[in-house]
From Swiss-Prot:
Organism: Caulobacter sp. (strain K31)
Protein known as: Large ribosomal subunit protein bL27
InterPro entries: Ribosomal_bL27 (IPR001684), Ribosomal_bL27_CS (IPR018261)
A Pfam family reported for this protein in Swiss-Prot or TrEMBL: Ribosomal_L27
Domain of life of the native organism: Bacteria
Region (Disordered): 1-22
Claim: Transmembrane is one of the keywords in the record: no
Amino acid sequence: MAHKKSGGSSSNGRDSAGRRLGVKKFGGQKVAAGNIIIRQRGTKFYPGANVGMGKDHTLFALIEGAVAFVTKRNNRTYVNVAAPVAQAAE
């Protein structure tokens, strides 16, 4: 017997949870070694100085310092971590 499915409410009602992607530490913020700076799909941002990239393209700090975003002439945005300047003891 041929039946037409009407509405489709039971076959359509689902969605996946958000993946919590994006920038976790912004420019100028202090980070410790191992801190996640950006979670991303693909290379929207590229690792620069003192920044590593995981297999899922997550960017993380390799040293303690401050985050800096730099856009180069090839229109790629690189994420750097600048080492903190040591204070002179007085």
